[in-house]
């Protein structure tokens, strides 16, 4: 009975050939407990009402769908920005952090652990940990702490312990590894609050569901403002949580083009041990990373390549399995932009609209700039502005100074 049940459970997390659960046996009971707990949680009216309360009164939802008049004039198409930068904390990450923290409380957990790259997910986890009374620990690569010191301090200010990861490339990939090691040791009282649509089932599904509030709002707001759905929706993609959250409510609306923009870094080249980019969808290969089969950056021996991007939040060697499936099936179009193109878009939105975007979101804006000239986006485009750029000002200033 148990073997059959586990087998059926594993099949639930498949997206074509991607997804699944490639984890140590010791984690399987915890994953099944999480799957069962989530099924109960999402069908519990009181729990959903509590989530709605926190999304509205703590996170500040719904976020505006803003008509970018000056950007629209420049590119000759109606450009709307989904303002996830206005969510409490400055990014879309709080949508998922609130959902998972309330799920953890529902399941009787008392301790939260998380990984973070740019620090936005870590900050969101620190926020919910503080307001809901959890002991909270965030793992962050030492390289990312150096380029996102303000976010590391914000987490500590809210009572979270930030643990620097000194192994590997000292970035998001390594932070996930350390968080998983912690979880294996402390399964009974700990919930691992994964920040993206990555990892073993049921995490990609759970994170997607909690982030889908973005796409649901876009759908309603587009009808209110334009009387129809957008021709194109653009979102940046590292692990892919903001992209999947924006895209998922539109999957069946085939007339809407869905474009995931990856970090092209210094160009789509690889050295022996590292990629000079983070473009897993565009040129990655099938492999296993952090408990799921997906598209990853790897060498000829199957070893994970270190990724690179000016944006800490996109600096990841893989991508969520559902996004890999949607890209391969043709429903989502994968594109990339370079560091320099993203920095140009960062400056352009700041100057034209008075909105400073995160470097992650700047990748989506940079593709808007590239594609608008060809007319491929149509007359009505939505760009998900996944976060604000305050956290990136020091990075941008350092680059300008040549530091």
Curated annotation (Swiss-Prot):
Pathway given in the UniProt record: Amino-acid biosynthesis; L-tryptophan biosynthesis; L-tryptophan from chorismate: step 5/5
CC terms in the record's Gene Ontology section: cytoplasm
Residues with the N6-(pyridoxal phosphate)lysine modification: 93
Signal sequence residues: none
Database matches in InterPro entries: Trp_synth_b_CS, Trp_synth_beta, Trp_synth_beta/beta-like, TrpB-like_PALP, TrpB-like_PALP_sf
Reaction catalyzed: (1S,2R)-1-C-(indol-3-yl)glycerol 3-phosphate + L-serine = D-glyceraldehyde 3-phosphate + L-tryptophan + H2O
Entry EC no(s): 4.2.1.20
Keyword entries, A-Z: Amino-acid biosynthesis, Aromatic amino acid biosynthesis, Lyase, Pyridoxal phosphate, Tryptophan biosynthesis
GO molecular function: tryptophan synthase activity
Co-factor requirement: pyridoxal 5'-phosphate
Gene Ontology terms: biological process: L-tryptophan biosynthetic process
PANTHER family listed in its UniProt record: TRYPTOPHAN SYNTHASE, TRYPTOPHAN SYNTHASE-RELATED
Subunit note: Tetramer of two alpha and two beta chains.
The family this protein is said to belong to: Belongs to the TrpB family.
Function recorded in the entry: The beta subunit is responsible for the synthesis of L-tryptophan from indole and L-serine.
Protein name (Swiss-Prot/TrEMBL): Tryptophan synthase beta chain 1
Organism: Methanosarcina acetivorans (strain ATCC 35395 / DSM 2834 / JCM 12185 / C2A)
Lineage per the UniProt record: Archaea, Methanobacteriati, Methanobacteriota, Stenosarchaea group, Methanomicrobia
